[in-house]
Regions:
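Active-site-proximal beta-strand elements of phosphoester/diester hydrolases
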Residues: 37-45, 152, 184-194
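Loop/turn elements at helix/coil->beta-strand transitions in domains of secreted/extracellular proteins
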Residues: 34-37, 94-98, 121-124, 181-185, ...
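Flexible, glycine-rich surface segments
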Residues: 195-236
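N-terminal, active-site-proximal structural segment of metallo-dependent hydrolase catalytic domains
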Residues: 23-117, 127-139
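Structured beta-strand-rich core segments of catalytic domains in phosphoester-bond hydrolases
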Residues: 104-184, 192
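Active-site His/acidic residue clusters
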Residues: 54-57, 183, 187-202
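Catalytic metal-binding/acid-base residues of hydrolase active sites
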Residues: 44, 105, 193, 235-236
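Bacterial Sec-dependent N-terminal signal peptides
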Residues: 1-31
C-alpha cells in the first residue's frame, strides 16, 4: 500500500515490515524482515511555562488558567516520554523509529522531550518548523538517525478565510522524505482544523486541509507513481 490514511485518533502505531531489506540467515534460507515502528501522537498542548507574546498561550503559564508550573510541565514530559518509549517495544525492543507529533508549542519542548530519561538513549533527531497558528501549536517529527536518513523536509501552509475576509492562521502540513533503512518513504504530518464551533461550521476548514494533503500527495506521485507515502495525523 503506497498511501496510508489515518483518521481521527490520538495515537497511531504502524509496525512496518520492509520487504526490500530482508536478511538471509546463514543457517537457512528464511527471510528475516527488519521491523520499524512508525507512530503518531497528539500530545495535547505540550507547552513550556514561558509566556510567548506572539501566541495565545496565556493559559499554559504559571499565572494562567491552567496554573502551568514547571512541576506540571515536567510531569507531562515524563508521561509522554514513557508512552513513546513503550510504543512497538514488544516487536522491536525499542521506541519508534519515526514518530509524528502535534500540539507542540516550539522546538524547546521537543528538546526537553527527547532528553527525558525514557528517551535520551534513543538518539532522536527533530524536524520542526514554527507555524503561524494563533494558539502557537505546531506539528513535528522525531526520527532515529541510525534508522532514517533524512533527504528533505518542507512545510505547506494552510490558510483559512473567515467570513469577514480575514485570514485564520492554522497548522502547516509537514512533509518529510528520507530512507527508512533502504526504502524511500514520504511522511506527511497533519493536524487539521478542529470541530470547535460545530461540525458544519468547521467543515470547510477540514475540506481545505484534505485538498492540501491531496495536493502534496499528487506532487509526490507525479515524480514517482509508486512512491511510498504515509499520511499521519489528527484529522479531527
Amino acid at each position: 500500500v503506497n498511501y496510508i490514511r489515518v483518521m481521527k485518533i490520538k495515537l497511531f502505531i504502524l509496525s512496518l515490515f520492509l520487504s526490500s531489506n530482508f536478511l538471509i540467515s546463514q543457517t537457512n534460507s528464511k527471510k528475516q524482515f527488519l521491523v520499524n515502528t512508525i507512530a503518531f501522537y497528539n500530545v495535547e498542548n505540550l507547552f513550556d511555562t514561558i509566556n510567548d507574546p506572539k501566541t495565545r498561550d496565556d493559559d499554559r503559564t504559571p499565572k494562567g488558567r491552567d496554573k502551568w508550573t514547571n512541576i506540571i510541565y515536567q510531569k507531562k514530559l515524563k508521561n509522554i516520554a514513557k508512552v513513546i518509549a513503550d510504543i512497538g517495544s514488544d516487536l522491536t525492543g525499542s521506541a519508534p523509529s519515526i514518530i509524528g507529533l502535534c500540539e507542540i508549542e516550539n522546538i524547546n519542548v521537543l528538546k526537553d522531550l527527547i532528553n527525558t530519561n525514557s528517551l535520551k538513549e534513543e538518539n532522536y533527531q527533530i524536524i520542526h518548523y514554527d507555524s503561524p497558528d494563533e494558539r502557537g501549536v505546531d506539528v513535528a517529527m522525531l526520527f532515529k538517525k541510525n534508522r532514517f536518513q533524512l533527504t528533505s523536509s518542507k512545510t505547506y501552509p494552510l490558510y483559512l478565510k473567515r467570513k469577514n475576509g480575514s485570514i485564520d492562521y492554522t497548522r502547516d502540513h509537514l512533509l518529510v522524505s528520507g530512507y527508512l533503512d533502504k526504502d524511500l518513504i514520504h511522511f506527511i504530518v497533519n493536524h487539521w482544523p478542529s470541530r470547535s464551533g460545530g461540525q458544519m461550521r468547521s467543515e470547510p476548514g477540514r475540506i481545505l486541509a484534505g485538498k492540501l494533503n491531496k495536493k502534496i500527495i499528487d506532487s509526490i506521485l507525479k515524480s514517482n507513481p509508486k512512491a511510498n507515502i504515509i499520511s499521519m495525523g489528527d484529522f479531527n
